[in-house]
Every structure is written in structure tokens, then in C-alpha cells.
Amino acid sequence: MKKISGIIIFILFIIALTYLNNNEIIVEKEETKLIKCIDGDTAKFLYNNEEIKVRFLAVNTPEIGENVEPYGEEASKYTCDRLNSAKKIELELDQESDKYDKYNRLLAWIFIDGELLQLDLVSQGYAEVKYIYGNYKYLNELKIAQETAKNQKIGIWKEK
């Protein structure tokens, strides 16, 4: 009986490993290379040897283009300047988040020279905490930064 239960446990372990490998939710930071900055919360990076569009997890910056919103251009310029001047860029996926959004963009935390870009954008008043569908890893820090930016009426919070 002990032999059979040992075999069953081993088989379940192998099945669990296979399941985890197939879903590929990597929670460690992975170094990447910027291909193109698109706007304040989206960019293209080289990820797993592929050019992929990445949506910055848990934040939203004002729109640019035809439907430009207040601080949209400033947020986009700030983000692009930060990304273009970075010595090291890393992506980190969040196990509480979907891997892709409805537009098939990878959802990730972005680190520039060790600093969380989303936290910087929220602190500077260029982004708001948005699209929260789980208990994301850096959510508490983002919420605190947003409250501080709101109280100080920085950036997008000047008018609100």
C-alpha cells in the first residue's frame, strides 16, 4: 500500500510540474531590451527572443493622439525618456494577474535600473492605479503613492 501511495504522489508531483511549466508565469525579474516606447503605459520589448508589446500592469496614463487627455503628452514623454535612458530594464510578471490583456499585450511590472516604473509614474502624478483584478505584488505601494500624489495635487490630480 505504501508503494502505491508513493507512486501516486510522484505522479501528482510530475503532473503539477508539467502544469506549472505550461503556464509559464515567471515571477522573477527578467532583463529585457526596449524596442520602442509607445506611450505612457505601453512599450515594445524584446522578451523571450520575440518583439512583444507590453502593457504596464496596474496603472493607466492619460491618452495621447486623437483623443489626447490632459497630461497625456507629459506622461508619454516622461515614460519614454526614462525607458530610453535606462541602463537596465527588467520585466516581472505577477502571479495574481492574467499574463495578457484583451489586446494580447503582455501585462508586466517594469523595472528601470532597479526602480519600479509604475511606482514612479504614480508618484509623479503621471498615472493612476487602475485595472486591478487581483492582489498584485506592488499594489499597496502604488496605492500609498497615489494617495500622496492626490493630496499634493501633483500632475493629473491638479484638476481633480
Where are the regions that the model predicts?
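Small beta-barrel nucleic-acid-binding modules, primarily SNase/OB-fold domains
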Residues: 2-160
